[in-house]
Design a protein with these regions (language model features):
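Catalytic machinery of carbohydrate-active enzymes
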Residues: 1-348
Length: 348
């Protein structure tokens, strides 16, 4: 069953009289980062209208569930191959929890399992769950673990659009993401403007220098924009030494709660930026080693600052240099120019 047909008939997609208990069961895999799970949120939320959805992801999925897809179930599991280093130290893998997780999932008797990642490890995991239908993007022979393989979208396609293609195969309509050029304000603010500025990122190669973020804060404050400054734990002392009040959330739930009071987000190419976009906040994201066409936050009014050219881009955070030139060469003036346009559209 590797053809291009939809699974709508195979899994008996619901009509208007069906209840949650007799909806088909859908297993969604997104083992990787906060940003990846936030990008999947539109698909997950839409899928709950047609399926009993279970999401397998890292534990912060429990924080996202009530906020972004309240009708989905969560099974938290940390896939060892998502570690940045030592991912194939098999002697350190949680074999017992892997066995328990797969046993639990097999007991659910899923009608469909899906992954939007071009990853044979996901496909093997789906095969072990014994889901009746397994849908994904095959690679290196992993089509043997799938019942439906989907051709990869064009190289320049956004990561969000892989979820759109998965949705097409199982009868879940998730529109393709297309970034829009924002040239004028479309809605007025009903409260004083407040903007999140988040200076952290999952990896150091994605962290724009803090002294440059400080200049952004100074400009925002001069423009009468209230700033909620958020940083990662290791950055806190620097900000406090520069007399800035800073918030260091202890969980994804705390991060989301803090951002609820804001109308826009400014930060690095990071999970918090994708979370902000999923929450409906327009984003201005400063990129370095990653490709913006793949991973810009999927808010239609979002803006990006492109990192400098590098022959190794994208390096997937494995920078070959002592410092990431692609990010270091993004000047304060370059970001300020974008920030002023961003504020005019979204915070004035």
């Amino acid at each position: 069953m590797h053809g291009p047909h939809s699974l709508a008939g195979v899994v008996r997609l619901p009509g208007g009289t069906q209840t949650m208990k007799n909806l088909p069961k859908l297993l969604v895999l997104e083992f990787w980062g906060l940003g990846d799970l936030a990008i999947a949120s539109s698909f997950i939320n839409k899928a709950t209208q047609s399926f009993q959805v279970t999401v397998v992801a890292k534990s912060y999925a429990h924080d996202l569930q009530p906020l972004l897809w309240p009708d989905a179930n969560v099974l938290a599991w940390h896939a060892p191959w998502t570690a940045f280093r030592g991912k194939y130290r098999f002697d350190r893998w949680p074999w017992k929890s892997l066995h328990q997780t797969l046993s639990t999932l097999r007991g659910q008797r899923f009608d469909v399992a899906v992954s939007a990642r071009w990853d044979p490890r996901d496909h093997l995991f789906m095969w072990f769950t014994k889901a009746s239908q397994r849908v994904g993007f095959p690679r290196r022979g992993s089509q043997w673990f799938l019942t439906q393989g989907i051709p990869m979208p064009p190289d320049q396609a956004h990561r969000f659009n892989q979820w759109s293609l998965v949705g097409q195969r199982i009868g879940v309509d998730v529109p393709v993401y297309q970034p829009q050029e924002c040239i004028e304000k479309t809605i007025g603010l009903d409260r004083p403007p407040r903007c999140v500025v988040h200076s952290g990122a999952a990896q150091p190669v994605r962290e724009w220098p803090l002294d440059r973020f400080l200049r952004l804060l100074d400009w925002l404050e001069s423009a009468k924009i209230e700033v909620l400054l958020i940083c990662d734990k290791h950055q806190r002392a620097w900000w406090e030494a520069h007399q800035k009040k800073v918030c260091v959330p202890q969980s994804v739930g705390e991060l989301a709660s803090a951002m609820k009071s804001c109308q826009a987000f400014v930060g690095n190419d990071s999970g918090p930026g994708h979370l902000a976009a999923a929450m409906g906040l327009p984003t201005l994201s400063i990129f370095g080693p990653q490709r913006t066409e793949w991973f810009r936050p999927a808010h239609p009014g979002g803006m990006v600052v492109e990192g400098a050219d590098c022959p190794y881009k994208p390096c997937f955070d494995a920078c070959r240099f002592e410092t990431p030139h692609c990010l270091e060469e993004v000047s304060t003036e370059q970001v300020l120019e974008q920030l002023k346009a961003f504020v005019k559209i979204h915070l004035s």
